[in-house]
Amino acid sequence: MLRFVRGNLLEAPVEALVNTVNTVGVMGKGVALQFKRAFPDNYQAYVKACERGQVQIGRIFVYDRGPLAQPRYIFNFPTKKHWRHPSRMEYVEEGLKDLVCRIQELRVRSIALPPLGAGNGGLPWPEVKQRIQEALEALEGVEVWVYEPVENPKAHSIVPLKTKPRLTPARAALLKLFGLYGALGEPLGRLEAQKLAYFLQEAGLDLKLDFACKQFGPYAEPLNHVLARLEGHYIQGFGDRTGISQIRLKPQALDEAVLFLADYPKADEAATRAADWVKGFETPYGLELLATVHWAVRHEGARDWASLQKRLQAWNPRKATFPKTHLQVALDALLKRGALRPEEWQDRPPKLPANVAQEA
């Protein structure tokens, strides 16, 4: 029996669940991220299978959790080769053929699957739905639940990792910086989290993040994996990256971080220093502006106004439109607060707008 339903796939009372994956061992968004958190044993087995080349288009990687587990089986269904690429309809079609074989081979009597490739994969749901119907409706004695696309899950409903990750100096300092930044109770988004982590590393704490200049300023993809691990234990609202993040510290998280940092004064000082650098720039645009100017001067050798403007124009059209008055305010703050050394800027000091100069 084939039925199309809505709700939480992970709560389906079935013998097997289908998880959509890529072939390179990454579960970073959407349904896959939910599975990674809910079934870490499956994730570890999937990563090892990818390393061995066992996860391929048209081949379901089945993970057996044992006869007493609910669900017993996780069917990892590749809908794309690389996590950066979109899903392809022919991959779904090939996978459905193997899915039918695996269901029959294992004598599965009930199974639930997501809208294969129609979420983050970008495939049109009506066409995917038709392929699913054609492939699975003829199965006899099998109850098939197909979960249709709905809005991205709310960040607070994302399943956290089952094991609380331990604090490290880097994680604790990041949590403290988030707490100082959000002292007024406002949540922060992924852009702000990226820029805060950038300044924390520039403040002297090696987070082992390799930042690069991206559309909205310095960006390090691995930071998202760090935040995903902290989600549900120390922070809430990061989500699965398919919607807007509204990150807040969970109750007691800041206290835990501060207590932990008592034994790591250098990490504690870096968090305090980074928080001081960003004062007055506590908006997504403000942090983007500040981090962009800092990056251009420190990492791309902009030493005067002409070279700074040239770097921004080469970055992208968005950066080229930053008003000079905004650049002056950002550069002045970075120099006066010690985020940039005096010798890093060889041109005349920034001339602040009259209203800003009076406030200073």
From Swiss-Prot:
Keywords from the UniProt entry: Hydrolase, Toxin-antitoxin system
Positions contributing to ADP-D-ribose binding: 8-9, 20-22, 31-34, 79, 117-121
Pfam families documented for this protein: Macro
Function text: Antitoxin component of the hybrid type II/IV toxin-antitoxin (TA) system DarTG, which plays a crucial role in controlling bacterial growth and bacteriophage infection. De-ADP-ribosylates DNA modified on thymidine by its cognate toxin DarT, which neutralizes the activity of cognate toxin DarT. Upon expression in E.coli neutralizes the effect of cognate toxin DarT. Upon expression in M.tuberculosis neutralizes the toxic effects of endogenous DarT.
Quaternary structure, from the entry: Interacts (via C-terminus) with cognate toxin DarT; this heterodimeric complex neutralizes the toxic effect of DarT by preventing ssDNA binding to DarT and consequently inactivating the toxin by direct protein-protein interactions.
Domains (record comment): The macro domain alone is able to de-ADP-ribosylate substrate in vitro and is almost as effective at neutralizing DarT in growth experiments as full-length protein. The C-terminus is a region interacting with the DarT toxin ssDNA binding region.
Similarity-based family: Belongs to the DarG ADP-ribosyl glycohydrolase family.
Protein name listed in UniProt: DNA ADP-ribosyl glycohydrolase
Species assigned in the record: Thermus aquaticus (strain ATCC BAA-2747 / Y51MC23)
Gene symbol of the encoding locus: darG
